[in-house]
Amino acid sequence: MQPFTYLLIYLMSTQREIKCKFNTITRTMKTSKIFLGLISIFTVCSLFTSCDNDTNDNVKRYPNAIVTIKPINGGASFNVWVSEKVQGPPSNLTKSPYGNKEVRAIANIKEEKDAKGKTKIYINWMDSIRTKQAIALKNTEMDLKKYGEDRLEIVNGFGTVVEDGYLTLRYSTAMRDLKAKRDINLIVQHSEKEPYKLVLAYNAHGDNKGRFASGFIAFRLSEIDKIAQKNGKKDVTLHLHWKSYQGDKHTFFKYHVRNDSK
């Protein structure tokens, strides 16, 4: 993730703001087009006639989507997954900048239609999110500790979403060194009673004090997909647990199972 992304996290309000009350199953979603970082720009623009162009340029600097970059033919081309209804090839790029890897990315995009009416995605910019597989453990109670029990917060806003086979999280935690090693893993704690239980494990490697900083991480839910398909489910409820600075927390996410065999 590029350094400026951390700054953007603090400046932006949400274009796709997720409001969920942790520890309950209540979860709603709404759309907002207001960016807090633009307030000062609008104030200055009222004094200058060149405001419109400057405002348009500044809007492009802020992320307005979390997408999946899906390589084709080894990355020679790729598709951009924006939502269940919006996906297609980029209109201004050919090769995937991430090669043959499928990754989640934070981006500023615009939906377009070609001459045949097919959807294409114009990419103003994008920045990859660290993307990894959720982990299935045989002895979760014993093995969880080795993955870390440090505390972090899951940000209730843009960037925290479950879609396209991924749990993407925007998190915040205390740290002194932005470049220090830290590990975040998602553990599938499957049982007959709770088949879709997930535990977020964080190891700060000792760097768990200082100022708070935010970041993004995405987990591919392949193991959850297998369990759900085995149970004949197309939609399931994920139960996520993590250790926060206020104590142990949990929340629920509705998840539409990804099926790549279609």
Regions found by a protein language model. Name each.
Residues 46-50:
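C-terminal motif of bacterial Sec signal peptides marking the signal peptidase cleavage site
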Residues 25-38:
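Bacterial N-terminal signal peptides that target proteins for export
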